[in-house]
């Protein structure tokens, strides 16, 4: 009897992996598609080498907006609202999306258009930086993300009256940074961190959870988490901003503030986002909901 159940379960899994569907990537849920993280990292560094590092001019005290997990299919209503508020706020400087930008095959261009500047709706052309999430890899989505959005690992600067701050986007979409990205991060922080007032890390998968709640695209291995915690403490990282789990959490550990931002997905009762004001004193948070 047990053998029959196991056989039927295996056949069902095989059918799910082989079936074609534009809404659910069963194969990707169990085994995320697209290139592995080391390959994405190498491609991202190559792309970074062909373009200048983005630099935003701001006051010593500046504000930016953060949202995550819009899971765009054909409905962009909450994302549109977020972008409209951001680009009409005279106190803002830029925005960040922490991954899981899409939830359906071929929707990366829909997401790109939704976060694009619209002269008839927006007063300011603030940039919005995008982080890659596990859902962005489904349906062989890395090619779309790379071609439509850009690299999954990159950094940008905010230049202000007292120098510069650095923001580093890490690719954790497979539930790991991978050996090559970890090695690069150690070397990059050792060589570059001292040039900046504040260092802020943005990534999709939160590094403090180890329950592997979302299978192969779940949470980061314990050994990697410990290495990142030590690295961020050592190099005085101010914030580590994360998404993925669709709930809010705010923890400070060893002087580093680790924040999970809740989802902005339109189906939820209270789609939320976060406004952060950065100054020489640190960071102040203002939680908001999409109206």
Model-derived segments and their meaning:
Residues 34-51, 107-198, 218-234, 239, ...:
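Extended active-site neighborhood of metal-dependent phosphoesterases/phosphodiesterases
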Residues 64, 95, 167, 199-200:
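Hydrophobic beta-strand anchors of alpha/beta hydrolase catalytic cores
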Residues 69, 99-100, 133-134, 204, ...:
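Active-site glycine-centered loops adjacent to acidic/histidine catalytic or metal-binding residues
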Residues 192-212:
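Short acidic, glycine-rich surface-loop motifs adjacent to enzyme active sites
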Residues 17-20:
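C-terminal motif of bacterial Sec signal peptides marking the signal peptidase cleavage site
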Residues 22-109:
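N-terminal active-site segment of His-dependent metallophosphoesterases
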Residues 1-10:
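Bacterial N-terminal signal peptides that target proteins for export
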Residues 200-207, 238-248:
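Histidine-centered catalytic micro-motifs
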């Amino acid at each position: 009897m047990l053998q029959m159940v196991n056989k039927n379960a295996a056949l069902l899994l095989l059918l799910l992996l082989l079936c074609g569907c534009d809404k659910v990537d069963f194969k990707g849920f169990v085994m995320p598609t697209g290139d592995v993280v080391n390959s994405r990292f190498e491609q991202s560094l190559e792309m970074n080498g062909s373009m200048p590092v983005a630099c935003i001019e701001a006051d010593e005290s500046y504000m930016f907006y953060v949202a995550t997990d819009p899971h765009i299919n054909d409905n962009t209503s909450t994302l549109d609202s977020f972008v409209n508020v951001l680009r009409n706020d005279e106190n803002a400087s830029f925005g960040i999306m922490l991954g899981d930008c899409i939830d359906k095959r071929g929707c990366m261009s829909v997401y790109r258009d939704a976060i694009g500047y619209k002269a008839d709706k927006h007063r300011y052309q603030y940039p919005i930086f995008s982080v890659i999430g596990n859902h962005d890899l489904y349906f062989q989505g890395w090619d779309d993300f790379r071609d439509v959005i850009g690299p999954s690992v990159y950094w940008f600067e905010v230049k202000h009256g007292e120098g510069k701050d650095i923001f580093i986007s890490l690719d954790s979409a497979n539930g790991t940074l991978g050996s090559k990205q970890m090695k690069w991060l150690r070397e990059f922080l050792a060589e570059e961190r001292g040039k900046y007032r504040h260092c802020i890390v943005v990534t999709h998968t939160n590094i403090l959870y180890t329950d592997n709640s979302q299978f192969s695209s779940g949470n980061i291995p314990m050994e990697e988490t410990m290495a990142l915690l030590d690295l961020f403490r050592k190099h005085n990282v101010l914030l580590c901003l994360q998404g993925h789990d669709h709930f809010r959490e705010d923890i400070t550990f060893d002087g580093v503030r680790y924040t999970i931002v809740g989802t902005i997905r339109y189906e939820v009762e209270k789609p939320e986002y976060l406004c952060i004001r950065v100054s020489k004193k640190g960071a102040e948070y203002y939680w908001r909901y999409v109206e």
